[in-house]
Structures are given as C-alpha cells and as structure tokens.
Amino acid sequence: MSTGSLSDVEDLQEVEMLECDGLKMDSNKEFVTSNESTEESSNCENGSPQKGRGGLGKRRKAPTKKSPLSGVSQEGKQVQRNAANARERARMRVLSKAFSRLKTTLPWVPPDTKLSKLDTLRLASSYIAHLRQILANDKYENGYIHPVNLTWPFMVAGKPESDLKEVVTASRLCGTTAS
C-alpha cells in the first residue's frame, strides 16, 4: 500500500533494478526469476525503463496490488461477518413474527390476506384510533372509568381533578358496596 513516503520511491526503484537482473514480482509480491528475454531485459541494457507507447516519454506506474491479508485475520473477519449476519437474521425473524402477530390481532383483516409492513402499521393505527374514539364516547357512562382512560398516576386523561373526584365518588355509590 502506497503511503507516498520516500521509502515507496526507493521500493519502486529496487523493483525496477531487480527486474533488470532477471527477477520479476509475481502476484504474491515475491520475486521470481524470469526465463524469458523480454522487453525488460532490453530496457535494462539501455539503463532506463520502457517509455510509454508511442514514445511519449511518460513512464507507466506499475499497478499496486494490496498485500493479501494473513489467513488469521481473514478468518477473524469471516467469523465477525458470520456473527453479524446471524444477528441480523435473528432480528429480522423477530420483526417478522411481531408483524404477523400484529396482523392477526387486527379484527377486520382475513388471515390469508397478504399485507405489507406499512399497510399493517396503517391498519393498526386506524384500529387504535377507532378504539380511542369508542372509549372517548363511552368514557363516563355508568360512572365507570375504563383503565385505558387513566394516565399515570391514575388520573382521567383531559379532566380536571375536581371532575375526577365527582366521577370517583359516583362510581363508589354505583358499585356493589352501596346498599
């Protein structure tokens, strides 16, 4: 990997000199002897590397190949990748099960209906809004406060405390303890 330092230039010059001596670098970044008498050997006799095609006078850069990762680090990366893939599959499995449970709880959706996740969420949201509306219309009927209408710490949502006290006393009077 090139860092742009002086040692990179020196390494490149060393490679060129070794190529002139009949050694070539193979794909594993190891030098091997060349039995062929090619253009490199003729260039070495001239004392300069081959110029670009057409005599433009520009020297081509040798393609730099990344050194292969050691077997240990490749195995470690593969293990990490497999673990991450397994975690993602488990997460998606849990998410899919949650969406299928949500779809089956919606009352007006037939079980064989295919719904996208977005459609499932939209239907669930509209169902929740529908239930809220029913509870809002039926909030104080018969002096009974539905637990959904209670907020922490058990106050009727949207009602002043004075109205709450009236509802609580009315529910006590209407309960089974009144005689």
Curated annotation (Swiss-Prot):
<dbReference type="InterPro" id="IPR050283">
    <property type="entry name" value="E-box_TF_Regulators"/>
</dbReference>
<keyword id="KW-0539">Nucleus</keyword>
<dbReference type="GO" id="GO:0050681">
    <property type="term" value="F:nuclear androgen receptor binding"/>
</dbReference>
<dbReference type="GO" id="GO:0046983">
    <property type="term" value="F:protein dimerization activity"/>
</dbReference>
<dbReference type="GO" id="GO:0060541">
    <property type="term" value="P:respiratory system development"/>
</dbReference>
<dbReference type="GO" id="GO:0060008">
    <property type="term" value="P:Sertoli cell differentiation"/>
</dbReference>
<dbReference type="GO" id="GO:0001658">
    <property type="term" value="P:branching involved in ureteric bud morphogenesis"/>
</dbReference>
<feature type="compositionally biased region" description="Low complexity">
    <location>
        <begin position="33"/>
        <end position="46"/>
    </location>
</feature>
<keyword id="KW-0805">Transcription regulation</keyword>
<comment type="function">
    <text>Involved in epithelial-mesenchymal interactions in kidney and lung morphogenesis that include epithelial differentiation and branching morphogenesis. May play a role in the specification or differentiation of one or more subsets of epicardial cell types.</text>
</comment>
<feature type="compositionally biased region" description="Polar residues">
    <location>
        <begin position="70"/>
        <end position="80"/>
    </location>
</feature>
<dbReference type="GO" id="GO:0048557">
    <property type="term" value="P:embryonic digestive tract morphogenesis"/>
</dbReference>
<dbReference type="GO" id="GO:0005667">
    <property type="term" value="C:transcription regulator complex"/>
</dbReference>
<dbReference type="GO" id="GO:0007530">
    <property type="term" value="P:sex determination"/>
</dbReference>
<dbReference type="GO" id="GO:0060435">
    <property type="term" value="P:bronchiole development"/>
</dbReference>
<dbReference type="GO" id="GO:0060766">
    <property type="term" value="P:negative regulation of androgen receptor signaling pathway"/>
</dbReference>
<feature type="domain" description="bHLH">
    <location>
        <begin position="79"/>
        <end position="131"/>
    </location>
</feature>
<dbReference type="GO" id="GO:0001227">
    <property type="term" value="F:DNA-binding transcription repressor activity, RNA polymerase II-specific"/>
</dbReference>
<dbReference type="GO" id="GO:0000122">
    <property type="term" value="P:negative regulation of transcription by RNA polymerase II"/>
</dbReference>
<dbReference type="GO" id="GO:0045944">
    <property type="term" value="P:positive regulation of transcription by RNA polymerase II"/>
</dbReference>
<dbReference type="GO" id="GO:0001657">
    <property type="term" value="P:ureteric bud development"/>
</dbReference>
<dbReference type="GO" id="GO:0006357">
    <property type="term" value="P:regulation of transcription by RNA polymerase II"/>
</dbReference>
<dbReference type="GO" id="GO:0060539">
    <property type="term" value="P:diaphragm development"/>
</dbReference>
<dbReference type="GO" id="GO:0060426">
    <property type="term" value="P:lung vasculature development"/>
</dbReference>
<dbReference type="GO" id="GO:0030855">
    <property type="term" value="P:epithelial cell differentiation"/>
</dbReference>
<dbReference type="GO" id="GO:0005634">
    <property type="term" value="C:nucleus"/>
</dbReference>
<dbReference type="GO" id="GO:0032835">
    <property type="term" value="P:glomerulus development"/>
</dbReference>
<dbReference type="GO" id="GO:0048608">
    <property type="term" value="P:reproductive structure development"/>
</dbReference>
<dbReference type="GO" id="GO:0000977">
    <property type="term" value="F:RNA polymerase II transcription regulatory region sequence-specific DNA binding"/>
</dbReference>
<dbReference type="GO" id="GO:0000785">
    <property type="term" value="C:chromatin"/>
</dbReference>
<dbReference type="GO" id="GO:0001763">
    <property type="term" value="P:morphogenesis of a branching structure"/>
</dbReference>
<keyword id="KW-0238">DNA-binding</keyword>
<dbReference type="GO" id="GO:0001228">
    <property type="term" value="F:DNA-binding transcription activator activity, RNA polymerase II-specific"/>
</dbReference>
<dbReference type="GO" id="GO:0043425">
    <property type="term" value="F:bHLH transcription factor binding"/>
</dbReference>
<dbReference type="GO" id="GO:0048286">
    <property type="term" value="P:lung alveolus development"/>
</dbReference>
<dbReference type="GO" id="GO:0042826">
    <property type="term" value="F:histone deacetylase binding"/>
</dbReference>
<dbReference type="GO" id="GO:0032502">
    <property type="term" value="P:developmental process"/>
</dbReference>
<dbReference type="GO" id="GO:0001822">
    <property type="term" value="P:kidney development"/>
</dbReference>
<protein>
    <recommendedName>
        <fullName>Transcription factor 21</fullName>
    </recommendedName>
</protein>
<dbReference type="GO" id="GO:0072277">
    <property type="term" value="P:metanephric glomerular capillary formation"/>
</dbReference>
<dbReference type="GO" id="GO:0070888">
    <property type="term" value="F:E-box binding"/>
</dbReference>
<dbReference type="GO" id="GO:0048536">
    <property type="term" value="P:spleen development"/>
</dbReference>
